[in-house]
From Swiss-Prot:
PANTHER family registered for this protein in UniProt: 1,4-ALPHA-GLUCAN-BRANCHING ENZYME
UniProt GO cellular component terms: cytosol
Protein name per the record: 1,4-alpha-glucan branching enzyme GlgB
Lineage, broadest ranks: Bacteria, Pseudomonadati, Myxococcota, Myxococcia, Myxococcales
Alphabetized HAMAP family for the sequence: GlgB (MF_00685)
Keywords on record: Carbohydrate metabolism, Glycogen biosynthesis, Glycogen metabolism, Glycosyltransferase, Transferase
Function: Catalyzes the formation of the alpha-1,6-glucosidic linkages in glycogen by scission of a 1,4-alpha-linked oligosaccharide from growing alpha-1,4-glucan chains and the subsequent attachment of the oligosaccharide to the alpha-1,6 position.
Record's subunit section: Monomer.
Pfam family, one: Alpha-amylase_C
Length: 734
């Protein structure tokens, strides 16, 4: 016979439960041995009466103790005794429920060990909220990391948001709190109420691992079952896994903000949903010929004006456009239409919103405590503590989550430079040097290398792309060679120089000729992607079309030339939506693109050009399969500054396959202009941006040329050409 529990001790422990200060409420609530029977305790301060309903039948009244605790002693039973609680509330409202404190933990020792080590690669399957059958009972298991909290409870629709009712238990020294709540189902809203261990008021936090959220500005997490969706993209995933060397593939990326690509004007100008976007966007991408789309961040974010770059819910797609399975449908549809999907991902910083990750358990948990490392001055955000195992695990598991649960084909990592440098956007005295006295963030470097190695090990064919704006070496080199391990790096230098050149009046371009040639000095130092991204059409910069000089005809001609120059240049391609048809207005995230312009002949001509560029680019290995290799590019005329003319050859790895590109970026027609060619014979015109179907003046070379055995530009053959104004020509042997 067990000795009955000491009443004073029980009272003291119950008081700690009431105050949300008990790390193990299961030790006093629920069912416990007591003498030759058991004692059952429940904390329901809002109840009028509670009865125990034994599984074998009967009804036992519980005694109401002070403070809202109910207790019943039942002789001749042990802890295997199964029961329900019948709870009566004011107004004779009666509910029968399972006691949440009668269940064993849902987390195992190995889960806790690997989470603490920072090596739990499927962390989202254990943390957060999970619908499951536990000991034969349907409900939801909740788990949250809050190591310094004095107490944690889960609150929501199921308990009237009363933080006293569902206190969680701390799982040893892991800092993880857990509770299984029976009968909580799909669609239930919830948060965690945390009592800081250092004192102060309780805080309400959204679940860092929530799979679904309310529609902002509401901030609650929502219980969601991720196991219901049936995918139809197995063929795409199989083909992707077999594509081991992504650098030899054509990559032409269309960057999209889902909330403003196209809006439903007849329904209050609302954004399209994920399911509405899927067929419309896929049809458009197939027409324009892009290989991939890249979505501005789709993870939940409290402020729409951040475009998704200040993430509040890393494991939940934004509810603005639908539910998680709706986004899965969107990606599934893209894959079935042969379109890859990349997603912008923000592991460098997060917002200060009170419901989010900042000061999560009353301390700097996900961020650094010292603002010299933990605050991002440019954006007013907080910086992740990459040196903490649990934080690093949270982020790397999140990357794997989007790949495995949403089948995305790649991550574009935002603001990598802000992660790599401790003094990024900080003045002297506002940052802390590393252990060697330098400004390199060793913890972030380790994190990025671990991220890239993990993604590539587990998911061959998936790419990780760095938005990195400095001269940091070996960003796209393998970790084994001392690199960071990314597949591609955005070429920000190329973007700045190219836009600067094309925005100048042609009369001045001869003095800035090197802005287009300089990039070839470092074009093969990394695996580059050439970005004309959303960042270049906001904050008063205007649109790509608007930055081009001249009258409307010249603006369109310049933009066509820019695109053809870009598609011929070494490096993969990325264009933000609206640029492909020359939208004059700067991008506004609250407005649809100006789709009516695609019916204007001039703007439709730009769109048709981009479609043809993508088609030729995909079909011609010379334009993509040696992007990162010096043998894939050769200058013919890098120094014709006085004429604003450039000429070069793009070569494939297979000998003999090549494309000659000639750009005349002046408004003057160049007649009888001689250019060297690798072969003597017939060359066909692959592209002429001045063609009539693109809105040009239709000058050119009648679709073909015949080179003669006159050496020129270091080549054995040459031809005299007509170079249309503000144009780019492509030729290939035919």
């Amino acid at each position: 016979m067990r000795k009955p529990a000491d009443k004073a001790q029980v009272d003291a422990e119950l008081q700690r439960v009431v105050e949300l200060r008990h790390p193990e409420p299961h030790a006093v609530l629920g069912i416990h041995p007591d003498g030759d029977g058991v004692v059952i305790r429940a904390f329901r301060p809002d109840a009028v009466a509670i009865h125990v309903l034994p599984e074998s039948g009967g009804r036992v009244a519980m005694t109401h103790r002070p403070g809202g605790v109910y207790e019943a002693r039942i002789n001749g039973k042990d802890q295997t005794f199964n029961y329900l609680l019948e709870v009566e509330y004011p107004g004779k409202r009666v509910f029968t429920l399972r006691d949440p404190y009668s269940f064993l933990p849902t987390l195992g020792e190995m889960d806790l060990y690997y989470a603490g080590e920072g090596r739990h690669e499927r962390l989202w399957e254990r943390m957060g909220a999970h619908l499951l059958h536990h000991h034969g009972v349907r409900g939801t298991s909740f788990a949250v990391w809050a190591p310094t909290a004095a107490g944690v409870s889960v609150v929501g629709d199921f308990n009237g948001w009363d933080g006293r009712l569902h206190s969680m238990r701390r799982m040893g020294s892991s800092g993880i709190w857990e509770l299984f709540v029976p009968e909580v189902g799909e669609g239930t809203r919830y948060k965690f109420e945390i009592r800081p261990g250092q004192g102060g008021p309780n805080v309400l936090k959204a679940d860092p691992f929530a799979f679904r959220t309310e529609v902002p500005p509401a901030t609650a997490s929502v219980v969601h079952d991720l196991a219901r969706y049936t995918w139809g993209d197995a063929a795409w995933l199989e083909q992707r896994a077999q594509r081991r060397d992504v650098h030899h593939q054509p990559w032409s990326v269309y960057e999209v903000h889902l909330g403003s690509w196209r809006r439903v004007v007849e329904d209050g100008d609302r954004p399209m949903t994920y399911r509405e976007l899927a067929p419309a966007l896929a049809e458009y991408i197939k027409f324009t010929g892009f290989t991939h789309i890249e979505l501005l961040p789709v993870a939940e974010h409290p402020y729409g004006g951040s475009w998704g770059y200040q993430v509040g819910g890393y494991y939940a797609p934004t509810a603005r456009f639908g539910h998680p399975d709706d986004l899965r449908f969107f990606i599934d549809h893209m894959h079935q239409e042969g379109i890859g999907v990349l997603v912008d991902w923000v592991p460098g910083h997060f917002p200060r919103d009170l419901h989010a990750l900042g000061q999560f358990d009353g301390t700097a948990l996900y961020e650094h405590a010292d603002p010299r490392k933990g605050a991002q001055p440019d954006w007013g955000t907080l910086v992740f503590n990459f040196g903490r195992n649990e934080v690093r695990n949270f982020l790397i598991a999140n990357a794997l989550f989007w790949i495995e649960e949403y089948h995305i084909d790649g991550l574009r990592v935002d603001a990598v430079a802000s992660m790599l440098y401790l003094d990024y956007s900080r003045k002297q005295g506002e940052w802390i040097p590393n252990r060697w006295g330098g400004r390199e963030n060793e913890e972030a470097i380790h994190f990025l290398r671990e991220l890239n190695e993990t993604v590539h090990r587990k998911h061959p064919g998936v790419v990780v792309i760095a938005e990195e704006s400095t001269a940091w070496p070996k960003v796209s080199a393998p970790v084994s060679e001392g690199g960071l391990g990314f597949d591609y790096k955005w070429n920000m230098g190329w973007m700045h120089d190219t836009l600067s050149y094309f925005s100048k009046d042609p009369i001045y371009r001869q003095y800035h000729h090197n802005q287009l040639t300089f990039g070839l000095l470092y074009a093969f130092s990394e695996q580059f992607m050439l970005p004309l991204s959303h960042d270049e059409v906001v904050h008063g910069k205007g649109s790509l079309y608007g930055r081009m000089p001249g009258d409307p005809w010249q603006k369109r001609a310049n933009l066509r030339a820019l695109f053809a120059w870009m598609w011929a240049h070494p490096g993969k391609k990325l264009v933000f939506m609206g640029g492909e048809f020359g939208q004059p207005a700067e991008w506004n995230h609250d407005k649809s693109l100006d789709w009516h312009l695609t019916h204007d002949p001039g703007h439709h001509g730009i769109l048709q050009l981009v479609s043809d560029l993508n088609r030729i680019y995909r079909d011609m290995p010379a334009l993509h399969d040696a992007d990162g290799e010096p043998m894939g590019f050769q200058w013919l005329q890098p120094d014709s500054a006085a004429y604003n003319v450039f000429a070069f050859v793009r070569r494939a790895r297979q000998p003999g396959r090549h494309v000659v590109c000639i750009a005349n970026l002046s408004p003057t027609v160049r007649e009888n202009y001689r250019v060297g060619f690798p072969f003597q014979g017939r060359y066909v015109e692959l592209l002429n941006t001045d063609a009539e179907q693109y809105g040009g003046s239709n000058l050119g070379n009648m679709g073909q040329i015949h080179t003669e055995p006159t050496g020129w530009d270091g080549q054995p053959a040459s031809a005299t050409l007509t170079l249309p104004p503000l144009s780019v020509l492509w030729f290939t042997p035919g």
